[in-house]
């Protein structure tokens, strides 16, 4: 009873799929808010370990500054297609801060950092673990 074998945990990584159009829109949005942070809501679908981003929403009443961006979640209309957020970091780091993790919304958080290009986008889960991104 006390000496049971521990079950092995098969860690399956979630994968994020972004279209070229979504990626270009995010890059343009981040550049337009520089040197402040910009934030968008991701719309999409989750199928098993695959998260496909199908749209972007500019959050109502969002706030932007050089070290923060956010929005009041209670002002959002109810929509089951919201799967997370993407926001920009005007610095050269696309790692989530403690503040980013504490204000996590949805299944995934994407961060794009300066100079705002495709390879500057990173995805994270609620615990700050990296997720794979596919741009197609």
What does each model-identified segment do?
Residues 85:
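Conserved, mostly hydrophobic/aromatic
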Residues 1-82, 90-136:
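Conserved beta-strand-loop surface patch within small alpha/beta domains used
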